[in-house]
Amino acid sequence: MANNKVLIFDTTLRDGEQSAGIGLTVEEKLVVAKQLERLGVDIIEAGFAASSPGDHEAITTITNEVKTPIIASLARCVESDIDVAWDALKKAERPRIHTFISSSDVHLMDILNKDPEQVLTMAVKSVERAKKYCDDVEFSPMDATRTDLEYLYRLIEATITAGATTINVPDTVGYTIPSEFRQRIELIKNNVPNIDKAILSVHCHNDLGNAAANSIAAVEAGARQVEGCINGLGERAGNASLEEVIMTIHTREDVFGLTTNVDTTQIYPTSRLVSDILSLIHISEPTRLGMISYAVFCLK
């Protein structure tokens, strides 16, 4: 891949569906996926196959009809999740298994009840298992922006050695700000010996309103895949708005010297389609501020 190309990873059908009050049928997901293909996104995360029969069916349906982009399924670092993800993806022209596990101390203690070495072993084994099914494997250390840096370097290095071709750095709770996120990406690039063997990706949440800015800061630092949702959909206050990220890269090519594969003339039709299917109304700034405030309250 050319070093000036930023890959666009759309997770509207997975993380976007976690927005409050949103649920899509298999047929609606297929309609959105076909429009995302017209838009020119590089990767469509079509769902989380192990989470429900509906997600499994949606992924399978999309793989049968959408052939140009990579189709991904999310999977926890659990053998059965990896197996179910592959079962849903096996007919895809370009399948990707995206596996994740928490990595911050707070998540390890309060959610997983495991120590760092146990988590590292689980991550490596899951990447190795996914690699037996397909060449394209993405790994995400969940809550990476609150993870001890030395441990994060080790975890990333180990999963790349195990076969991960994309390493995604999630700001899971929307905690960071652009300057420190940029620094974290730079530190990863400078301290993980085999980082050149994987594409570095970012996945930013908007709890403090910084998701798009954090994504752009990461791109400036060398990330070459950005994850986000159409219309900034997503859990709590949402994900990075892909429209904002894409148009920043395209409009300010003079600054970044970067491009994407997106057909920008399809951004408006895609946004409208998603809005119409979800019966969304324009979210005013006071409403958005309320959503962000609520998200911050929930995370305390």
Regions found by a protein language model. Name each.
Residues T11-T12, T172, T287:
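Ser/Thr-centric signal marking residues that sit
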Residues L24-V41, N64, E79-V137, M142-I195, ...:
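Alpha/beta enzyme core
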Residues T176, I185-L280, S284:
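Catalytic alpha/beta core domains of metabolic enzymes, predominantly
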Residues I8-T11, I44-A46, I70-A75, P95-T99, ...:
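Hydrophobic faces of well-ordered beta-strands that scaffold small-molecule active sites
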Residues M1-V78:
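N-terminal capping/small domains of soluble enzymes
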Residues I281-K300:
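Single conserved hydrophobic/aromatic residue that forms the stacking wall/gate
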Residues D15, S19-A20, F48-P53, S104-V106, ...:
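Short, small-residue-enriched loops and turns at beta-alpha junctions
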Residues S51-K91, D115-P116, D148-L155, R184, ...:
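Active-site loop-helix segments enriched in His/Asp/Glu that coordinate
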